[in-house]
Amino acid sequence: MFGPEGPTLRELAVQALSSVERGYDLLAPKFDRTPFRTPGSVLDAVAAALERTGPYDDGLDLCCGTGAGLDVLTRLCRGSVTGVDFSAGMLSVARARVPAAGPRVAWVRADARALPFTAAFDLVVSFGAFGHFLPRELPGLFTQVHSVLRPGGRFAFPVLAPPRPATPGYWMLLGFDAVMRVRNALWRPPFVMYYRAFRLGDVRRELERAGFRVELQPLPEFGRRRDGSPRARMVVARRPD
């Protein structure tokens, strides 16, 4: 899973025993060489799906990390593009990754639960960040996103179908979450990262409570499971006009 240029086991251990913010500051220089980075195939599929409803004017990448979502927003947005993250280390890598982006791109250090914007965006995207939020934090998070979107704006993010109980992936994720719960019960500060806590039914309900109109769009690039359900969907939450 990790190449020779990725983090060592010791580096991952130090990260896991840190806070979320400090952990990602430490991991940032090697983050793009880990399996934690959202694959390009997912980014391209989301961009292709959103192109059918665009173009947009101003876009925000929520919890942008090292800037993987930047290419999606620059393809879709005619105006400004902003990345927001609370890790200074991740933002530093993002700035270095796109040095020629110019004034059209801005990077802002802030907590997604207290965004420093007014209704300034037509599109908000996020990739692979929701495991860092506990279920009880979703109402506040989605209310924040609703507040920074202009009327008619969209909040979009991909969701992969969970693995079946009979597959190794199911037990791997179950084991990871169990280890993290034990770690957080015994060690401070906590490191919030749970793969199985972000459940689509709960997410849709909380988005609607925050005032969004929610649609689920299959991402056909990833095919369907044996029961006919999509392997991947894009959640599109629209702020009413």
Language-model region placement:
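Conserved class I S-adenosyl-L-methionine
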Residues: 1-54, 72, 156-180
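Class I SAM-dependent methyltransferase SAM/SAH-binding core
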Residues: 60, 66-114
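A conserved beta-strand element that flanks and buttresses the S-adenosyl-L-methionine
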Residues: 125
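A short glycine-rich, Lys/Arg-flanked "PGG" loop and its adjoining helix->strand segment in the class I
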Residues: 139-151
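Acceptor-substrate binding/catalytic loop of class I
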Residues: 186-200
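Conserved S-adenosyl-L-methionine
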Residues: 212-223
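Core SAM-dependent methyltransferase catalytic element
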Residues: 223-241
